[in-house]
């Protein structure tokens, strides 16, 4: 499992709970980042994943963008491709 400072490579799609998709890496290059530099909900959720796993993360606003856009609870489909 990745740790809190691991660099992860993922594909993801993000939605607001009204079904509005606001971002996606699917169909393009995978997204890479350190888990301590993304929203807290990703830091928590992706640490529970194993390589190759796909998971849906329901992230409350206080673990997402905290009033910034997009606001409210967010839903991310995440595929963990690799980590180190």
PLM segments and residue spans:
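Cross-family detector of peptidyl-prolyl cis-trans isomerase
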Residues: 1-84
């Amino acid at each position: 499992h990745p740790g809190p400072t691991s660099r992860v490579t993922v594909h993801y799609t993000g939605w607001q709970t009204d079904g509005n998709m606001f971002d996606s890496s699917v169909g393009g290059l995978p997204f890479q980042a350190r888990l301590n530099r993304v929203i807290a909900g990703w830091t928590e959720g992706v640490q529970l994943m194993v390589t190759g796993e796909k998971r849906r993360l329901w992230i409350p606003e206080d673990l997402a963008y905290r009033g910034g856009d997009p606001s409210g609870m967010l839903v991310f489909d995440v595929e963990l491709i690799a980590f180190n």
